[in-house]
Amino acid sequence: MKIRPLVPAVAAAALCLPLAGGAADNPKFSRNEILIGVLTDMSGPYASLTGEGDVAAAQLAIDEFGGKIHGVPIKLVSADHQQKADVSSARAREWIDRDGMDLITGLGQSALGLAVQGLASSKKVITMNTGAGSPDLTGSQCAKYGIHYSWNTHAVAVGTAAAVVDGGGKSWFFVAADYTFGKSLQDQATKVIESKGGKVLGGVRAPLGTSDFSSFLLQAQGSKAQVIGLANAGSDTLNALKQANEFGIVKGGQKVAALLMFITDVHALGLPVAQGLQFTT
């Protein structure tokens, strides 16, 4: 099994739990065990970034820590959130109310990450988002028991957008994921673009898990924008880039900027498809 880019964050989530336990001389845990739940994408567009790799790395972290804290064994469970906030909330509620969950991690999608964080915090259970990127996790919907680990949409959007505009990419058209994450990426990038004298000519929203981006890319191509910004991630980004290559968008003179990209994505695409791509990581 290959260890994916977001996996080290999940490992860190498992290791952070001792900090809470060490605060007391006699820490108490559910049913005399430390129960960690990895709620992740096992079958959807983010499975290659999270999924089974998340679970494997969390288990590695537990093993490396000796499998116990203060003599209390650590148990790991996992589930597929199916990219649905209601499914995630139901699973989290079951874990907390029935099993006495101590920490829920993973949550690699903003809408469900926010939903589970709110639910868990109301029950005084820690969540550590390692994949969701919405700034609302620590902003408007900040929760006492919620931890947002790693990046957020402000950081990744601002870095790429600023560099591309400074390099001459003044006019933009966005192809964004049609949920909180995509909207946030586009909004954050737009602020930077406009602050630097650039313009956003338009944008379209593609449903999460889209396989055919042709209609969205044709609109972007027809906008004559200098830069087509991809405000998505995972297989959505890969599918959009493969089809952009088929349409000859970069060869035609437009730039493509991916706002969230990992080196493993570049490897998956291959150099002929990825060349000319603008991104920061």
Regions found by a protein language model. Give the residues of each.
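Beta-alpha junction/loop-to-helix N-cap segments that form part of ligand/metal-binding clefts
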Residues: 24, 29, 33-35, 48-54, ...
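Extracellular/periplasmic periplasmic-binding protein-like sensory domains
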Residues: 244-281
